[in-house]
């Protein structure tokens, strides 16, 4: 053999079998940035149709977690696939930089503003802290292979962005959507500030569940409403009973609310202390049961409408409150009578406005009752629940109480219960200029993926309250408005003033607002009457208006609007919604054309990531151990529309899949050794049939892969890629061609046909891989022949190219069409089972020791005969003869194909030292005593002729 070794076309490539990604990827990254890969892509795609994926900004605090990695990788895969599809798809990553978490981190270092440091110094410290956090996260994202404008990202704290956020506020005010109101808002007593809907999370909490008596101020007036005849009025005090789980709100009670069409019953409670109580008829039994009242009877009935404006005594204060009517009253639980405190609830506030009720708010920003709060001054509201219960017992107003576990709003930062508290705030009004209806209309024009996203956001927008956009914080974009000191009306020249302030902020940042002398801007006369608003904007406003502050403003987008927003499914109540509402308020249209959502990352058992459980998978650990391409492949392999599971075992499966794809690519590259596309490509019509079939399979795969990319169905991309590499190529084509590729005449037609197919296929394969396994695709690209088929030099990077358009398929009218090769593969699969059995029974060693006789029915025999002597190369045996089924021998074995029996014989022919086939002509040719005639031709002659395989 040694004398013929140099005549073989052994595979050779510098592309290593082992990825060693953790070591190699950083080296590739360095080259990408040294050679400005992102700039090269932008240059290559200049003037093409644009695709804008607008980045939802992560918060600039802490290390990135696996959820960040999932989100950014999905975006990067989609953008790279769009680039390969011929789009100009710039990516400008962003960061959310204002707000409380950063304030809290800075407070730990320098104390609260106004104590050791001034507010101005505090803001500067916040800016420095956020900048450092951005840099840390940026490096982590770059390590994942994410390409973008990393040197020029957008940060909501950039002076120009802060200025544009103020301009957005001005536009919303201009369009009539801004509202100043004294309204109940979500309030965190730990933050000392209002919260947006998106900053509230719900968790279970145990509260006191209480039924409270409100005595009738005029018993006769109440009894008259129930139409009771004289002598049948019953005995004892008359009370209406409310149910609540927030006893601390009772000091602010200003009404009891009923439903107009609901039936209410006046119940006579019997016993030593008789009394008469009013509850909804439907709930009477459950009220009596929980109060432990066994002996009672009904005295009369009335509707809620009958009882409207009847007065009842507050349970512990000296004033009376009216019975009012509201549609929010239900019979799901409670008593059918709702305690109404307009200062502590949105529905209470709304119904209170209809009746002109006082909006009482006895609670300070720290959650403590104000000094003038009778009975409870100085107590924290949650601790005061017990005090309220004691007072109710004293006054004889407590009918029943028990501990009650229920879902309750909590601050997403502090994880502590929040309250509703009426304060003067600025709102984007959903109603006063028809914003809610406009937003609901705009939703219908957006493509939501998955489609349930549409109904989800519709429900949220339809039911949401006014958007409270003001915050009482230090580190935030100011609500740059001037209001009249007495009337609180906006300055009549607000639009011009906002633009002047925005210009100042563009030069000096938000501190310019606090440094601004009102008289300088307004003049002395106006300055005497108007004052600056000192509140800051909700950070959801900051990020929500980036469709204007960033997308409309950045020249990289060339005036294009965002095509896509892609975030986690929690953003229907967060960024998707704040962006939608602000865009409709500013531009009367949605800020996006399509919205794609992904689920949350959980562990292999479906549990949330938790440090206490110890199941956290950090992206940095994965890249340091396995490499970013494994993490990227994991992301693309999942159905990201639901929960996305990750664990060491799941990542190991991704690593295994990666190895199969890498090894397939390596086979292609190793067998292109010595191939020059400019001179060595075989014309399509002259190629061996099986080679054309393989290119056709690549074409079919490419069509499906491109479609899957277009549908953002990334796991379908991975499945098709795996199927192509493992099944169509690995299990069949590559297995069959090894003999021809290694043993055919070097540079001869048989080898060059095979190499032509391999070249075309790897040109396509490397592009399919590029959006997902970006580092490996770049590595493959650099190991490919430097020249392309047309003689031009290969681009420096695969990412600047487009899908390969040089593939071709078999025509269905051809004799050896796709259906033919499908049948051949089935035969091969059946034969392989018999060969495996023969090996197990020690009849043969390898398959080349076998000679086959295939007894086939006429239809199948005719197909097999088309391959002639080349059938043996497809079946990987030294001989394969086709005979009619009628001649079937006793030794022939049945297969799982109807009409096919196969006899496996051990060959008696000599083994060729070069190709290892056993043929009768081994050693029969002078000068070549150990090789077969085919090999002699490949070594010294014209080379063997292959037509089919």
Curated annotation (Swiss-Prot):
Gene3D superfamilies listed in its UniProt record: 1.10.730.20, HUPs, Ile-tRNA synthetase CP2 domain-like
Cofactor remark: Binds 1 zinc ion per subunit.
GO process annotations (BP): isoleucyl-tRNA aminoacylation
Substrates-to-products reaction catalysed: tRNA(Ile) + L-isoleucine + ATP = L-isoleucyl-tRNA(Ile) + AMP + diphosphate
PROSITE patterns: AA_TRNA_LIGASE_I
Enzyme class: ligase
Short sequence motif named 'HIGH' region, residue ranges: 58-68
Binding-site residues, ATP: 611
Binding site for Zn(2+): 912, 915, 932, 935
Positions in coiled-coil regions: none
Keyword field: Aminoacyl-tRNA synthetase, ATP-binding, Cytoplasm, Ligase, Metal-binding, Nucleotide-binding, Protein biosynthesis, Zinc
GO cellular component, one term: cytosol
Subcellular location: Cytoplasm
UniProt family annotation: Belongs to the class-I aminoacyl-tRNA synthetase family. IleS type 1 subfamily.
HAMAP family: Ile_tRNA_synth_type1
Primary role: Catalyzes the attachment of isoleucine to tRNA(Ile). As IleRS can inadvertently accommodate and process structurally similar amino acids such as valine, to avoid such errors it has two additional distinct tRNA(Ile)-dependent editing activities. One activity is designated as 'pretransfer' editing and involves the hydrolysis of activated Val-AMP. The other activity is designated 'posttransfer' editing and involves deacylation of mischarged Val-tRNA(Ile).
Free-text comment about domains: IleRS has two distinct active sites: one for aminoacylation and one for editing. The misactivated valine is translocated from the active site to the editing site, which sterically excludes the correctly activated isoleucine. The single editing site contains two valyl binding pockets, one specific for each substrate (Val-AMP or Val-tRNA(Ile)).
The protein, known as: Isoleucine--tRNA ligase
Highest classification ranks of the organism: Bacteria, Pseudomonadati, Pseudomonadota, Gammaproteobacteria, Vibrionales
């Amino acid at each position: 053999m040694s004398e013929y070794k140099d005549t073989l076309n052994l595979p050779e490539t510098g592309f290593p079998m082992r990825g060693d990604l953790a070591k190699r990827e950083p080296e590739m990254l360095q080259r990408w940035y040294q050679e400005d890969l992102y700039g090269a892509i932008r240059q290559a795609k200049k003037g093409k149709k644009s695709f804008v994926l607008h980045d939802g900004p992560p918060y600039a605090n802490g290390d990135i977690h696996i959820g960040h990695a999932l989100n950014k990788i999905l975006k990067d895969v989609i953008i790279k696939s769009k680039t390969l599809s011929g789009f100009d798809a710039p990516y400008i990553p962003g960061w959310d930089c204002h707000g409380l978490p950063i304030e809290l981190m800075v407070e730990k270092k320098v104390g609260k503003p106004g104590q050791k440091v001034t507010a101005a110094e505090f803001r500067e410290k916040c800016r420095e802290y956020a900048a450092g956090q951005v840099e840390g996260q940026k490096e982590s994202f770059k390590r994942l292979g994410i390409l973008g404008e990393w040197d020029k990202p957008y940060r909501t704290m950039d002076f120009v962005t802060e200025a544009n956020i103020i301009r957005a506020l001005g536009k919303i005010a201009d369009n009539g959507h801004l509202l100043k109101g004294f309204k109940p808002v979500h309030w965190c007593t730990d933050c000392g500030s209002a919260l947006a809907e998106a900053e509230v999370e719900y968790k279970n909490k145990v509260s006191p569940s209480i039924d409270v008596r409100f005595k009738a101020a005029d018993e006769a007036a109440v009894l008259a409403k129930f139409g009771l005849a004289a002598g049948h009025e019953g005995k004892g005090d008359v009370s209406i009973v409310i149910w609540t789980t927030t006893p601390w709100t009772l000091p602010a009670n200003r009404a009891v609310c009923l439903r107009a069409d609901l039936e209410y019953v006046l119940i006579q409670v019997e016993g030593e202390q008789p009394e008469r109580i009013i509850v909804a008829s439907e709930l009477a039994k459950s009220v009596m049961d929980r109060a432990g009242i066994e002996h009672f009877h009904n005295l009369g009935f009335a509707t809620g409408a009958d009882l409207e404006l009847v007065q009842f005594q507050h349970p512990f204060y000296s004033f009376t409150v009216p019975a009012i009517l509201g549609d929010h009253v239900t019979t799901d639980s409670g008593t059918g009578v709702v305690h109404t405190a307009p200062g502590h609830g949105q529905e209470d506030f709304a119904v209170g406005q209809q009746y002109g009720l006082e909006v009482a708010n006895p609670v300070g920003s720290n959650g403590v009752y104000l000094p003038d709060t009778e009975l409870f001054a100085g107590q924290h509201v949650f601790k005061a629940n017990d005090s309220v219960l004691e007072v109710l017992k004293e006054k004889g107003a407590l009918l029943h109480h028990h501990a009650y576990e229920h879902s309750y709003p909590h601050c997403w930062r502090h994880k502590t219960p929040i309250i509703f508290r009426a304060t003067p705030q600025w709102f984007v009004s959903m109603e006063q200029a028809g914003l809610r209806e406009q937003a609901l209309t705009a939703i219908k024009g957006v493509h939501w993926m998955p489609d349930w996203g549409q109904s989800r956001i519709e429900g949220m927008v339809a039911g949401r309250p006014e958007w409270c956009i003001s915050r009482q914080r230090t580190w935030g974009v100011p609500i740059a408005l001037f209001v009249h000191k007495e009337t609180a009306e906006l300055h009549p020249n607000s639009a011009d003033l906002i633009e002047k302030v925005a210009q100042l902020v563009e030069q000096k940042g938000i501190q310019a607002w606090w440094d601004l002398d009102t008289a300088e801007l307004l003049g002395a006369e106006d300055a005497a009457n108007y004052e600056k608003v000192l509140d800051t904007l909700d950070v959801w406003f900051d990020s929500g208006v980036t469709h204007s502050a960033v997308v409309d403003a950045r020249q990289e987008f060339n005036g294009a609007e965002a095509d896509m927003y892609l975030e986690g499914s929690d953003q229907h109540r967060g960024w998707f919604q704040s962006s939608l509402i602000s865009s409709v308020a500013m531009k009367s249209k949605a800020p996006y054309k399509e919205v794609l959502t992904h689920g949350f990352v959980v562990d292999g058992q479906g549990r949330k990531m938790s440090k206490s459980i110890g199941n956290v998978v950090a992206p940095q650990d994965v890249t340091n151990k396995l490499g970013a391409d494994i993490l990227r492949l994991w992301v693309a392999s999942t159905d990201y529309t639901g929960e996305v599971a990750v664990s060491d075992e799941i990542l190991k499966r991704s690593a295994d899949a990666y190895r199969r794809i890498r090894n397939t690519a390596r086979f292609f590259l190793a067998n292109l050794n010595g191939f020059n596309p400019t001179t060595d490509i075989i014309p399509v019509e002259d190629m061996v049939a099986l080679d054309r079939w393989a290119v056709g399979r690549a074409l079919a795969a490419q069509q499906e892969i491109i479609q899957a990319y277009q549908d953002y169905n990334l796991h379908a991309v991975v499945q098709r890629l795996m199927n192509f590499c493992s099944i169509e190529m690995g299990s069949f084509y590559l297995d069959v061609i090894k003999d021809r590729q290694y043993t055919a005449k070097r540079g001869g037609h048989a080898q060059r046909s095979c190499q032509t197919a391999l070249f075309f296929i790897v040109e396509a394969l490397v592009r399919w891989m590029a959006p997902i396994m970006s580092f490996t695709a770049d590595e493959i690209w650099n190991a490919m022949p430097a020249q392309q088929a047309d003689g031009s030099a290969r681009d420096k990077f695969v990412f600047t190219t487009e899908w390969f358009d040089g593939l071709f398929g078999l025509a269905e009218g051809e004799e050896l069409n796709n259906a033919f090769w499908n049948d051949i593969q089935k035969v091969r699969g059946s034969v392989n089972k018999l060969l495996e059995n023969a090996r197990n029974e020690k009849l043969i060693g390898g398959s080349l020791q076998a000679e086959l006789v295939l007894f086939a029915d006429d239809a199948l025999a005719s197909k097999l005969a088309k391959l002639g002597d080349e059938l043996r190369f497809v079946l990987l045996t030294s001989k394969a003869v086709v005979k009619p089924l009628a001649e079937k021998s006793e030794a022939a074995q049945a297969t799982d194909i109807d009409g096919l029996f196969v006899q496996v014989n051990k060959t008696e022919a000599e083994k060729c030292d070069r190709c290892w086939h056993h043929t009768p002509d081994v050693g029969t040719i002078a000068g070549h005593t150990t090789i077969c005639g085919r090999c002699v031709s490949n070594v010294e002659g014209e080379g063997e002729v292959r037509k089919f395989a």
